[in-house]
Amino acid sequence: MTQVTVKELAQVVDTPVERLLLQMRDAGLPHTSAEQVVTDSEKQALLTHLKGSHGDRASEPRKITLQRKTTTTLKVGGSKTVSVEVRKKKTYVKRSPDEIEAERQRELEEQRAAEEAERLKAEEAAARQRAEEEARKAEEAARAKAAQEAAATAGAEPAVVADVAAAEPVAKPAAVEERKKEEPRRAPKRDEDDDRRDRKHTQHRPSVKEKEKVPAPRVAPRSTDEESDGYRRGGRGGKSKLKKRNQHGFQNPTGPIVREVNIGETITVAELAAQMSVKGAEVVKFMFKMGSPVTINQVLDQETAQLVAEELGHKVKLVSENALEEQLAESLKFEGEAVTRAPVVTVMGHVDHGKTSLLDYIRRAKVAAGEAGGITQHIGAYHVETERGMVTFLDTPGHAAFTAMRARGAQATDIVILVVAADDGVMPQTQEAVQHAKAAGVPIVVAVNKIDKPEANPDNIKNGLAALDVIPEEWGGDAPFVPVSAKLGTGVDELLEAVLLQAEVLELKATPSAPGRGVVVESRLDKGRGPVATVLVQDGTLRQGDMVLVGINYGRVRAMLDENGKPIKEAGPSIPVEILGLDGTPDAGDEMTVVADEKKAREVALFRQGKFREVKLARAHAGKLENIFENMGQEEKKTLNIVLKADVRGSLEALQGSLSGLGNDEVQVRVVGGGVGGITESDANLALASNAVLFGFNVRADAGARKIVEAEGLDMRYYNVIYDIIEDVKKALTGMLGSDLRENILGIAEVRDVFRSPKFGAIAGCMVTEGMVHRNRPIRVLRDDVVIFEGELESLRRFKDDVAEVRAGMECGIGVKSYNDVKVGDKIEVFEKVEVARSL
């Protein structure tokens, strides 16, 4: 950039040099001569100073006043109304930085003064406490000294008492003497009553020895001084010191008692009330007020119970009822030498962008041609030996219905290869794949596919992914972009090299000598072999014969197959295998662990099943209760019931999610039954009982099911592409919606004159201005564009001839059935009602 002197700058801004130097000095700049150089930052400082001096700084409004006026009408009886106008005015003041700083200083001063006052108060309290302690010590010392003096003079006291007694006149009332004679006889009885009363007010029963004790000897008469202390003797109203001492009075609590409530994953209303020390009816009443009608024995889920306890003012401690799970985690020991393992790579991207074709080239196998419709509908797991080492690949579907599968693939992986077609760009599933990878914290390697096409534009891909925070390495980011062609094999070696380089950076380790641990990628029900689960071993070694626990299922590994279907005896880290021998089909994403014995596996599996059932029931019940008031008074939705069977668990989940999302306020889809495997007799009976349609995705019905379908006339359909199921269900829902009546305006005629007819009454002489007027069609009579009559066109004539229709620009006579109040200037609108099919 060229340097500018003060003189040149003065010429540019058309001002004298002396004035410019004066302004620069006011702005705090060091320039004193016309030949000194002015930098860009100094120009900016000068411009800011000049703007401030010319009042631009104050051009911003410091105060905004909003005025709001609302007018309402108040009825005061009869037809009288009073207009009430409410005006509200609010002023918002923008404070300057100096005012903000002064406010902050004032708050600091107030805080400091409050702290000082608190400190002085604490010092005064401490001084008062010290003074009280010293006074107490002095009082104790004086009391001890007085006791010593009393002990020293104790010897002379009896003589003094005797002298005093001799000096007293012997003149006591007879009643006192009589009472003194009878008191020794009453004394033992009173003591027994006292003992009995004492025993009544204590929790302990007297021992046998205490019962057999000899009664105590009679005590000496009590002096009248004791009576003056507030004791009354004899009579029914007699009071004793023991009764006063042993009786406990109820004290009202000074504040609400806050209790700690332990809430597991499920809890009944009665258990929750007991922990809060309130009646169950109170909790039921409170939940009714919250809009949740419950019973005292109803099971609540953890979230609902937490909300209720917190609303009632108690502390909540969420506890996990996972003692068995914790014991299982402690028993799993991964000891041994950790070695480097192969990376698990997930291939993700939009549908038809070439993910499976790229894997085909790497594996030298034709998988894409075998997938129905050319799209991947399962998670494929393969491991490939390359020159630089082994790599395990997971291929995920790209269709929108397979969101859960893609998320599952990202969580079981180390590196994500994001395949983007160079001729298509960043698409919705591409964005979703980036979100899944970032949520799992997995590094991304971008493969820009189809670069052999002439319309390929790799720069467009970089710009699109940079907007999603995937920055190429050449732009200073951390995501390698590798141009490849799955068709020609261009750039595949560079892609594998980039993947293995990322794996080296991650330093992936595993312990092959430990028991196997992994994750379920996919599961299905095979007719000949039973439940089959595709498992990716993540750590340790899985061997044939191991007892495994997979989610809520367990079993002994009877056989293991690699991705080519060949039997193997063991599988190390990062190896995908199919295992046989489980008692059911686990959900994809469930964790697999090798346990010591079958007893432990069965115990944990049954515990998980029970917990899963409880949580599911609690949530289902809560959902029903929430909707009970919303649905009250509304028309019931039309429901399409479906029994759905698929070949693998992942496809079943994807289909259930997609079908449940269809529908609107009037129609809905309900999957009444679903599972993995072929269509059986029980599925057909379920469809018959629930009036449902049977859908089979890549599966077929057995002979018993086909017999029921034919006999009962059930609707059963087979599919192998997910698009076809969704389209058919949409069509069925559209048919259930029914149709709408739509009005089409056929023509408009303007009344020019009115005639009288003995047969039809008033006849309107009209000019057809728009469209065409038809006989025997419904009409509306409009006066000043307001509908005043709706009826039927009875007579339509032209030159005394009855006609069926009259076109625009022609005159005609119109007779309206049962209406004679036609006037000049009215418009007659002829229309028809058409039934139109509705859509979702």
UniProtKB/Swiss-Prot annotation:
Binding locations of GTP: 349-356, 395-399, 449-452
Sequence ranges of Basic and acidic residues compositional bias: 95-143, 175-191, 223-232
Annotated transmembrane regions: none
Location in or out of the cell: Cytoplasm
Region feature G2, mapped onto this chain: 374-378
Entry GO terms, CC: cytosol
Annotated region (G1), positions in chain: 349-356
InterPro entries: DNA-bd_dom_put_sf, EF-G-like_DII, IF2_assoc_dom_bac, IF2_II, IF2_N, P-loop_NTPase, Small_GTP-bd, T_Tr_GTP-bd_dom
Region G4, annotated ranges: 449-452
Molecular function as annotated in GO: GTP binding; GTPase activity; translation initiation factor activity
Predominant localisation class: cytoplasm
Key words of the record: Cytoplasm, GTP-binding, Initiation factor, Nucleotide-binding, Protein biosynthesis
Gene3D superfamilies: P-loop containing nucleotide triphosphate hydrolases (3.40.50.300), Putative DNA-binding domain, N-terminal subdomain of bacterial translation initiation factor IF2 (3.30.56.50), Translation factors (2.40.30.10), Translation initiation factor IF- 2, domain 3 (3.40.50.10050)
Xref: CDD domains: IF2_eIF5B, IF2_mtIF2_II, mtIF2_IVc
Protein family per UniProt: Belongs to the TRAFAC class translation factor GTPase superfamily. Classic translation factor GTPase family. IF-2 subfamily.
NCBIfam families per UniProt: IF-2 (TIGR00487), small_GTP (TIGR00231)
Purpose of the protein: One of the essential components for the initiation of protein synthesis. Protects formylmethionyl-tRNA from spontaneous hydrolysis and promotes its binding to the 30S ribosomal subunits. Also involved in the hydrolysis of GTP during the formation of the 70S ribosomal complex.
Entry protein name: Translation initiation factor IF-2
Organism from which the protein derives: Pseudomonas aeruginosa (strain UCBPP-PA14)
